[in-house]
């Protein structure tokens, strides 16, 4: 089947392995189970003294991505300072008692300043605030300072790293969150009131997180430079790690998996505000989006050098035709997008909100990336991107199902090699030379080894030529006396020994004949 009508298929897709592996045909329907169920394929054979015990890990194979793939992502995702705060939150979770001091530690985590989202030092002027905002508000009220008017329509984002940029908007936000000179409290805040204030503070944390993300996307040029640079590095890494699939099979080694995986994680880390997500959440997002990232990066790369002029042709009997055709169609749609929008679309695939529905931060990050995509690609990109990401997600599920089926077949094949000899009726799976080696090859190899040994040790060559002396210690294997010809042979040996003992003559080696 020729797929050249819809464009060439990128060779360094994760599914490029499936178009080259010579496996038995598998049912192309993903809705109905195959004719031979996995339970029947993996059912253990009857126990026998000539068959080894197969480990349970082979009888119950895990999914393809549950071992090396998952552990590699967990080891490659680095921890950040935010993880320490959330680990403290995990240690304090479940405790109903609040902290005794005015510090930020409570049963729900760290309390942030309601003005700049920095770590709050206590309850100041009616709100939780940091030392910087507390001092700024006190100076502004006591000295009655009139600040210069804002040049950005009084709509500046006030965060920890830019709170001194616009003092007019900072004072305005102090008043907006409820800071008042009359609300100053001396002494300790009661626990009940502090708990109530903290609940209200939790409601405003979403807005604070949105502001923290938005401040990192103010400079659109810098954002695009970071993402495009990491995206180009990812494409170059994928091209180096794989070769042309129409000339040789793709190698399945640790470098073949780890190096592209590290490049995909580096691309995710280049997304502004992505490292502000906790390590556990980033691992979960990457485990469910690495395939999407590699597919989008591969489809948008230049792959003309990896394919013959007539396009890519594959054997229908050795691959599932649905998956290559789907990749071909999605790749053509990706190449029709504006080039500057593909890196942003890939970043959106990493931060999809449905991959981590319990967290607000990935959803807020995805919202900001959608805004960037709209500015770069316009309404057309916003209209086509959701359906494209949905199709990529469906293809990811097909890919997982395909690998799981291949894993079951390979495990069943390994069991047949361990449990029972392979029948001669399967020349496709094993070469004939492996199934039944010729006898001439065995005799030739054994004789050549013996001759080489004699040449290296001429001093014992004569010993090898002498007839073997039969030991009289009785250390030979016990004979089965139930056989008639064995009983006759034993009787003749006993009579011969008695005659020799009577004659007092040393026995002379003779050749017995039936």
From Swiss-Prot:
Q: What are the protein's GO molecular function terms?
A: nuclear receptor activity; RNA polymerase II cis-regulatory region sequence-specific DNA binding; zinc ion binding
Q: Species lineage, top-down? A: Eukaryota, Metazoa, Ecdysozoa, Nematoda, Chromadorea
Q: Which CDD domains match?
A: NR_DBD_REV_ERB
Record's GO cellular component terms: nucleus
Region described as Disordered: spans on this chain: 28-48, 465-514
**Record carries keyword Metal-binding:** yes
How is this protein named in the record? Nuclear hormone receptor family member nhr-85
Its gene is nhr-85
| Principal place of residence | nucleus
Any Gene Ontology biological process: negative regulation of transcription by RNA polymerase II
Zinc fingers, NR C4-type, are found at 113-133, 150-174
Going by the UniProt record, its keywords in alphabetical order are:
DNA-binding, Metal-binding, Nucleus, Receptor, Transcription, Transcription regulation, Zinc, Zinc-finger
Q: What does this protein do?
A: Orphan nuclear receptor.
- DNA-binding positions are 110-186
Looking at the record, the residues that make up the NR LBD domain are 216-514
Give the location in the cell: Nucleus
């Amino acid at each position: 089947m020729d797929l050249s009508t819809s464009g060439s298929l990128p060779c360094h897709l994760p599914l490029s392995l499936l178009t080259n592996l010579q496996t038995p045909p598998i049912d192309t329907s993903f809705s109905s189970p195959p004719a031979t169920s996995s339970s029947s394929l993996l059912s253990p054979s009857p126990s026998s003294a000539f068959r080894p015990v197969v480990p349970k890990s082979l009888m119950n194979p895990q999914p393809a991505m549950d071992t090396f793939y998952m552990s590699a992502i967990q080891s490659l995702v680095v921890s950040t300072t935010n993880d320490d705060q959330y680990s403290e939150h995990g240690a304090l979770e479940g405790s109903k008692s609040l902290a005794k001091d005015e510090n930020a530690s409570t049963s729900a985590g760290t309390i942030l300043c309601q003005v700049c989202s920095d770590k709050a030092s206590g309850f100041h002027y009616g709100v939780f605030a940091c030392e910087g905002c507390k001092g700024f508000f006190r100076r502004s009220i006591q000295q009655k300072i009139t600040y210069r008017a804002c040049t950005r329509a009084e709509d500046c984002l006030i965060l920890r790293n830019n709170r001194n940029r616009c003092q007019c908007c900072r004072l305005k936000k102090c008043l907006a969150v409820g800071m008042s000179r009359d609300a100053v409290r001396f002494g300790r805040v009661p626990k009940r009131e502090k708990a109530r204030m903290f609940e209200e503070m939790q409601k405003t944390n979403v807005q604070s997180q949105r502001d923290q993300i938005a401040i990192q996307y103010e400079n659109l040029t810098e954002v695009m430079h970071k993402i495009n640079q990491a995206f180009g590095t990812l494409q170059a890494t994928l091209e180096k790690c794989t070769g042309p699939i129409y000339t040789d099979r793709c190698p399945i080694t640790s470098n073949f998996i780890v190096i592209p995986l590290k490049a995909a994680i580096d691309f995710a880390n280049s997304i502004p505000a992505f490292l502000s997500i906790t390590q556990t959440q980033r691992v979960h997002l990457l485990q469910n989006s690495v395939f999407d990232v590699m597919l989008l990066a591969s489809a948008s790369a230049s792959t003309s050098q990896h394919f013959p002029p007539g396009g890519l042709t594959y054997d229908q009997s050795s691959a599932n035709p649905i998956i290559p055709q789907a990749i071909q169609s999605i790749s053509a749609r990706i190449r029709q997008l504006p080039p500057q929008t593909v890196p942003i679309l890939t970043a959106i695939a990493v931060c999809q909100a449905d991959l981590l529905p319990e967290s607000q931060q990935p959803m807020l990050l995805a919202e900001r990336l959608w805004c960037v995509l709209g500015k770069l690609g316009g309404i057309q990109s916003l209209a086509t991107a959701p359906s494209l990401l949905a199709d990529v997600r469906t293809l990811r599920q097909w890919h997982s199902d395909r690998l799981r089926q291949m894993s079951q077949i390979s495990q069943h094949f390994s069991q047949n090699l361990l449990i029972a000899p392979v029948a001669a009726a399967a020349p496709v799976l094993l070469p004939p030379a492996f199934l039944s080696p010729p006898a001439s090859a065995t005799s030739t190899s054994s004789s050549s080894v013996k001759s080489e040994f004699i040449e290296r040790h001429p001093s014992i060559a004569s010993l090898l030529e002498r007839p073997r002396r039969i030991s009289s210690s009785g250390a030979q294997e016990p004979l089965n006396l139930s056989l008639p010809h064995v009983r006759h042979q034993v009787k003749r040996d006993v009579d011969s020994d008695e005659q020799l003992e009577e004659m007092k003559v040393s026995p002379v080696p003779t050749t017995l004949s039936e």
